[in-house]
């Protein structure tokens, strides 16, 4: 049976600045997706909007009250009326402050909850993506998605949209009140708007691309930094510090230059807004002075309009600031949504068969596999594993040994052929169901930051302390664990730093034992341990494998001699099959591999064959 999923190539997440000058439909799609994260908190959103609408007239009301105070009470010496209007003004200021406090608190709660949901969706989605996706996408880039990109959304979701609504309503009330007070001065103020709108549209197109460039180079910066921190020992051993610093400087310079471009646009835009607002104020003052000289205008109107000018341009300034935030957020959202929309290779569990146990056989039949199209790693592989059987797979590096396990564990789909478990096609079985049956001990053991106990119980978090200690005793890990500060509560550093390779390998064996799989896979599991540790593991693995179907992948042939059957792979092809003695008797590839690792056996065999009468 052919698995068509491999016919589609897994593309890396595009990190370049794509689709420059995106269409509005794309922006609408992004906004609609973001709104789905706000929808669960619609009560909070509705309350924040209602309070924003209700309080949006309080700011514009203050200059009007000032105008009334001057023209109706100060000019006429009406102290009682002035006291009342002053109290109203103080009340408006107080209510405006309360409104701002409540809306700020509500919008921050909305934003934080939405950002939490986005991060959780990204993490769950990343857990579903297949191994091929991670082969082609740098970890640093993905980290940028879940940190910098998500954080860029925080301010927009926290205050951006609702603040914009409040600013627009304030502008509306300001224009209405200005027109009510004096329509001629209002037209002078509004005459600046066309220039401002044109500048904003022009600015939007350029700053959008600039922000995409910044995020692109930030992802590259994070990727390079993460890779080199992980491989710092290699950099130092090969004396590559200066050369790698030069590479980093180039990437860092790209990020710096991208930021400078955004700063350049803002350094033009913000002074332009300030200049326009000052020009409007100057025109209003000049025209007001002309009318005052003609006794065609009151002092209260002039004072209120000077206040209105700054109030009018303050929401516009806020809108431009929010526009900055939104441009950053839209660029980040585009990248996040493209990641969340990456569904290639994700299994749809509906219709997949669940299997609770392994009863009879695993069969590979004419299986072909390639990590890259047509670059075949496995070629027409066929073999069967019976329940309770101990199978060893040996061969040179790159022969496809680990690939077979990756296929069986459903980490990678095969291209052609058929793989079945108890007669059921592997692609038709749910991934979770297959992996529940298989426990894998890898050559490179990964330990998570946390306690020894948490790492041991990773596959079975409900295990009791007694069961955990017994498993450690069986494997022989209890001795070194008890000697650690804190024992089973010893804090493991990132990826097990501070523990030896042998200690990490023992932890992996305990973890597999506690997982209690029906099929045990040992993938070069003892290749990085010393002789003493290997002797501890040998006793434990014999006990582990006695009641389980076992697959042993090994480069060192000394670890596979007790296997029921040994498969010998060479360049993706099954060359030989049989037990240890049968394969030695054939004097084929296995025999040659054995002599390479045990040259003394070849000397002994040659000496015996030279004795007369011995063949």
Per-segment meaning from a language model:
Residues 140, 213-261, 351-353:
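Loop segments that connect adjacent transmembrane helices in multi-pass transporters
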Residues 348-349, 355-615:
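ABC-type nucleotide-binding domain
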């Amino acid at each position: 049976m052919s698995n068509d999923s491999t016919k589609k190539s897994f593309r890396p997440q595009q990190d370049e600045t794509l689709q420059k000058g995106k269409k509005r439909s794309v922006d609408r799609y992004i906004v609609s997706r973001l709104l789905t994260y706000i929808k669960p908190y619609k009560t909070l959103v509705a309350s924040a909007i209602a309070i924003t609408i209700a309080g949006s007239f309080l700011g514009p009301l203050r200059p009007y009250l000032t105008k009334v105070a001057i023209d109706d009470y100060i000019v006429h010496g009406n102290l009682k009326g002035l006291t009342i209007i002053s109290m109203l003004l103080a009340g408006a200021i107080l209510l405006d402050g309360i409104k701002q406090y409540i809306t700020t608190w509500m919008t921050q709660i909305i934003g934080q909850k939405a950002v939490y949901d986005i991060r959780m969706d990204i993490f769950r989605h990343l857990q579903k993506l297949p191994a091929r996706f991670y082969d082609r996408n740098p970890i640093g880039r993905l980290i940028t998605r879940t940190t910098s990109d998500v954080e860029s959304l925080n301010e927009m979701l926290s205050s951006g949209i609702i603040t914009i609504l409040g600013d627009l309503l304030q502008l509306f009330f300001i224009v209405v009140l200005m027109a009510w007070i004096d329509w001629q001065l209002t037209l002078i103020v509004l005459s600046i708007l066309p220039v401002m709108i044109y500048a904003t549209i022009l600015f939007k197109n350029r700053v959008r691309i600039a922000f995409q460039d910044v995020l692109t180079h930030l992802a590259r910066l994070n990727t390079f930094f993460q890779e080199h921190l992980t491989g710092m020992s290699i950099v130092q051993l090969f004396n590559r510090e200066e050369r790698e610093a030069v590479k980093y400087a180039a990437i860092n310079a790209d990020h710096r230059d991208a930021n400078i471009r955004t700063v350049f646009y803002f350094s033009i835009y913000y002074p332009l807004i300030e200049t326009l607002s000052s020009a409007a104020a100057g025109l209003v003052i000049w025209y007001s002075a002309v009318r005052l000289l003609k006794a065609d205008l009151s002092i209260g109107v002039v004072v209120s309009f000077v206040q209105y000018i700054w109030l009018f341009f303050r929401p516009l300034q806020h809108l431009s600031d929010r526009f900055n935030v939104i441009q950053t957020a839209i660029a980040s959202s585009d990248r996040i949504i493209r990641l969340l929309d990456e569904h290639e290779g994700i299994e749809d569990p509906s219709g997949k068969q669940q299997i609770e146990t392994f009863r009879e056989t695993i069969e590979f039949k004419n299986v072909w596999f390639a990590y890259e199209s047509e670059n075949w790693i496995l070629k027409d592989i066929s073999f069967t594993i019976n329940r309770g059987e101990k199978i060893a797979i040996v061969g040179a590096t790159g022969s496809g040994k680990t690939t077979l396990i990756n296929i069986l564990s459903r980490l990678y789909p095969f291209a052609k052929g058929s793989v079945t478990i108890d007669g059921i096609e592997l692609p038709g079985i749910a991934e979770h169901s297959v992996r529940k049956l298989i426990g894998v001990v890898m050559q490179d053991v990964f330990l998570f930051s946390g306690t020894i106990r948490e790492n041991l119980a990773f596959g079975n978090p409900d295990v009791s302390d007694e069961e955990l200690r017994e498993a450690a005793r069986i494997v022989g890990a209890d001795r070194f664990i008890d000697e650690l500060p804190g024992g089973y509560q010893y804090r493991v550093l990132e990826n097990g730093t501070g523990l030896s390779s042998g200690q990490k390998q023992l932890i992996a064996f305990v973890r597999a034992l506690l997982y209690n799989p029906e099929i045990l896979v040992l993938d070069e599991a003892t290749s990085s341990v010393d002789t003493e540790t290997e002797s501890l593991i040998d006793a434990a693995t014999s006990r582990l494998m006695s009641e389980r179907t076992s697959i042993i992948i090994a480069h060192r042939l000394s670890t596979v001699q007790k296997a029921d059957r040994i498969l010998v792979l060479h360049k993706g092809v099954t060359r030989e099959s049989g037990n240890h003695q049968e394969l030695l008797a054939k004097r084929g590839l296995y025999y040659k591999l054995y002599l390479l690792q045990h040259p003394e056996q070849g000397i002994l065999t040659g000496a015996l064959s030279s004795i007369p009468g011995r063949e």
